[in-house]
Amino acid sequence: MAAEVIDMSRHKGAHPRIGATDVCPFVPVSNATMDECVQVARSLGKEVGEWLGIPVYLYGEAAVIPERHILPDIRKGEYEGLPEKLKDEKWQPDYGPVEFNDNVRRTGATVIGAREFLIAYNVNLDTQDIQIANKISGIVRDSGVVQINEKGEKVRITGLLKFVQAMGVYLKERNITQVSMNLLNYKVTPPHVAFEEAKKQAEKFGVHVTGSEVVGLIPKEALLAAGRFYAGELSEKQLIAAAVERLGLSQLNKFIPEKKVIEYMLGLD
């Protein structure tokens, strides 16, 4: 459907993307194993490449090539860099066409894989300065930043939060910036830990965190952990309410647990 209604040659956006259906992950939420998700991802990738004529890269646990395990590595260069990427032997797609033909010009590429549950989590800043958002992102993300030492050598300074990807984003419609994060393992770095660290770093730059948002769904346990951190032991409903309030999850759009918590959406509770 995305490939039918989105023409990538005319698409503009703030978030990195490589195609109309940018990424399609399979996650073992309930009654499924990671191996099963890997098999489904590879099977779908083959069909998308052969039947729809879209270049497909396999990532995460489904990656066949180790260098393609991490999504941002595949996205590097984004859609605009896809013509050159397809010419590079190291970046030939796992399935689908290897040339930037008219169909690929419209659809872009697709990244399909298997991974653990990822929380797309953005922290809102009361500044329009994207450089500040980028600096905070570099400090907190796992990969950190590359700096030049006194010898003129490039050295990587590791970030503060494990299993976290982050970048600064400017929201034109809101006139604010965000530290846009992917929490790759919320059991190691849950939302409230990322929120508090972003708040701490923001204060060093003279700006404030005003709230946050969850893009897509979130596991119930992540909210319960936040609720316990801020409010102690309460009922499930009260813990989730405390998490929503203290994380400012309704600042941009009202956070409705029944529509945002994956267990509630799937009827698992």
What residue ranges belong to the model's regions?
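Long, contiguous binding/interaction regions
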Residues: 1-269
